[in-house]
Amino acid sequence: MAMSLLGITFGIAFFVVTQAQTSGFEAFFIRTILGTNGAIKVSDRFQDMDGTVSRTDQDGKTRFSFRSREESRYTEGIETPHLLRKALSQFKGITGISEILEGNAILDGGSRSYAISFHGIRINDHISVSDLGNQIIIGDLSSFESDKMSVLIGSRIAQRLMISQGDRVTLKGGTGNIQLRVAGMFESGVSQIDKNRIYLHLAKAREFKGERFSGSIFQVGIQNPNVAPQIAAQMQETLGHRVVSWQEREKVWLDVFKALRVSSAITVSSILLLSGLGIFNVFAIMVIEKTRDIAILRSMGFSGSDASAVFLWQGIIVLIFGIIAGTLLGILAT
């Protein structure tokens, strides 16, 4: 009986631990992604702006036809960011909008060079749609905000180039080279970002890339990230731009977490099944050993169902205590 109780206890505890661990990793991943790349991204414009076409028939009625944009071509970037920003602000649930100009360049730290991806941002807008303010590990945002020739670099980039706060670096490529001062380092928790991304001011990024107005994208923050797919679909249909929610962008990783939860549940269920078989064997042997006692109970007027109930209640009590003990053990372990 004790072995059966231990089997249930450790089976439930293992289930709680594995599910909590997977859920914790998933929550951390989602929090990191939302704090870095935002809930929604608005980018390229559809070339066919006739996604919805209205026509007036001979009877005077206006009818609408909808064309699928699945095979549509795109015009790279946003051509009129100020107008699109105004349109985005009209949607409900929007908490912030940040215009970003992306590009690739070479960052020269003096003794070493490294290929990076730069994001031109307006810092006050960007901290409203990201967690950049809490990701700074060296330096501060006020220093970056006050110096238009400054840059924030990923922690992995700083390690590879062996540069520190206040050092001068050169951004090479685009229309030429520009000298920047390192205002700070950030650590997002995503190694791919920390070893490839830098932030500089949007105006300086436009000057470096040679694009005065167009070519940027928008990162949008919303109150409830869980409804991002619905809001993204509304934006795409209304604005005629490619709009991607974080669920669509990170679908592969979210599917991985689902698979991990299912696999761990199957594993633990197998353990519990074995524990159940153990309980069955224990009670089968117990019934055989208690044959004389059962006969005495029957002679005293107890029915067969009454005698069976004694053993069933023993099994239920073992199960309940095992579940409670396993749950508490799992909570303590996590």
Where are these regions (language model features)?
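Basic-flanked hydrophobic alpha-helices used for secretion and membrane insertion
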Residues: 119-122, 140, 152-242
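Short, strongly hydrophobic transmembrane alpha-helices
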Residues: 1-24, 33
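Short acidic/glycine-enriched loop/turn elements at secondary-structure junctions
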Residues: 73-181, 207-208
